[in-house]
Swiss-Prot record:
The keyword Chaperone applies. One of its GO terms (biological process) is lipoprotein localization to outer membrane. Belongs to the LolB family. GO terms for cellular component: cell outer membrane. This is Outer-membrane lipoprotein LolB. Monomer. Disulfide bonds: none annotated. SUPFAM superfamilies: Prokaryotic lipoproteins and lipoprotein localization factors. It comes from Xanthomonas campestris pv. campestris (strain ATCC 33913 / DSM 3586 / NCPPB 528 / LMG 568 / P 25). It is a lipid-anchor. The gene is lolB. Residues 1-20 form the signal peptide. A lipid is attached at residue 21 (N-palmitoyl cysteine).
């Protein structure tokens, strides 16, 4: 596997780790997950309000750093995600190799386009298939907008969700992955609380995401 494809594949693993490695249509999960945690009524109301606010503000972006490992392979890079409703524009960059790739697509249609690969861009009606052919990894990009914001967890096919004292997801178990929301960006006048540090693991695969900045349009 070339260095370009290997680095992109590892970054793809990071996205897959945060998403549970399964493509599930938005809002069409399986059985309801087991929700664990003693949460006050005020905390439940606050979390309901947080999720409602996020669903009412579909234009947002974040910049962060990702570190991943699987077996003997590992790597790190930067991730710049921009979302406008169902449309996304994601830039992946590896500072060590000074290489970057751009993924664009639409979560409604499922179509996507990947640029920055040897041989030119690749596009198709199924963004996940485009990525699979380019990297060898199945990456459920259509679920990422909800997962990185800890939004609609119950609809994403999770088997178990542990809540913290504020009613937010603390740990999510899905399809062999354990995803921990370890740190949150405090709420401000412009936006509610959002995940800052997320770690995911599945066997010898480990993923760490640190969000440096969230930006949400009013």
């Amino acid at each position: 596997m070339s260095q370009v494809i290997r680095t992109l594949a590892l970054t793809g693993l990071a996205l897959a780790g945060l998403s549970g490695c399964v493509s599930v249509p938005r809002g069409q999960g399986g059985a309801a997950p087991a929700v664990v945690g003693q949460v006050s009524e005020s905390a439940q109301q606050a979390e309901t309000a947080r999720q409602a606010w996020l669903q009412a503000h579909p234009a947002w972006s974040f910049q962060g750093r990702v570190a991943i490992s699987k077996g003997r392979d590992g790597g790190s890079g930067r991730l710049d995600w921009q979302q406008d409703g169902p449309r996304y524009h994601v830039q992946l960059s590896a500072p060590v190799t000074r290489q970057s790739w751009v993924l664009t697509g639409d979560t409604t249609t499922g179509a996507g386009r990947l640029e920055g690969l040897d041989g030119g861009p690749r596009a198709g009606a199924d963004a996940e298939q485009v990525l699979l052919e380019a990297t060898g990894w199945t990456i459920p990009v259509n679920q990422m907008p909800d997962w990185v914001r800890a939004l609609r967890i119950a609809d994403a096919g999770a088997a178990r969700v542990d809540l913290d004292e504020h009613g937010r997801p603390r740990t999510v178990q899905q399809d062999g992955w354990t995803i921990d929301f370890l740190e949150w960006t405090p709420a401000s006048a412009a936006q509610p609380e959002l995940p800052r540090r997320i770690e995911a693991r599945n066997g010898d695969a480990k993923v760490r995401l640190l969000v440096d900045q969230w930006t949400l349009s009013p």
